[in-house]
Curated annotation (Swiss-Prot):
Binds 1 zinc ion. InterPro entries: MetalPrtase_cat_dom_sf_prd, YbeY, YbeY_CS. It comes from the Bacteria. This is Endoribonuclease YbeY. Zn(2+) binds at residues 114, 118, 124. It comes from Anaplasma phagocytophilum (strain HZ).
Amino acid sequence: MPVEVSTIDRKWYRIIRKPKATSQEIVLFALRELKVDRYNPIVSVVLAHDALLLELNHKYRNINKPTNVLSFNYEALSHNCCLGEIFLSIDRLTYESKTLGVEVHAHFTHMLIHGVLHILGYDHEVPEDAQEMQALEIDLLSKRSIENPYLIQE
């Protein structure tokens, strides 16, 4: 089950120890826990910065500001599928961590799990879907000894 990781911004190496291996481990953990690892999907993770996420957010969502995570689903879940691509911004991640008073690694893990759920088809556009997605995030994060991020934001 390949998880391909590209590190576009070198700042990731100062913030996350072994960003490639850490990203792979978190994605594989989420896929295992969600019981979709048996499909052996390919997932791509791009560790980027605000400039790239601003460009992608504007191009694909018509939103002219950077964001913390963007996910693109490429294929429906099937054996050996190219499931999707997850982009993370180091700038948003570090800013939000400081603002929320959350450890960077915990926020990184949360955003990566959030991205995995998006490429699996979960969304948070309507309240019922948001509750389902948040419940999954909270459960997965708790299994990694990370507290509920939605309590912190209140």
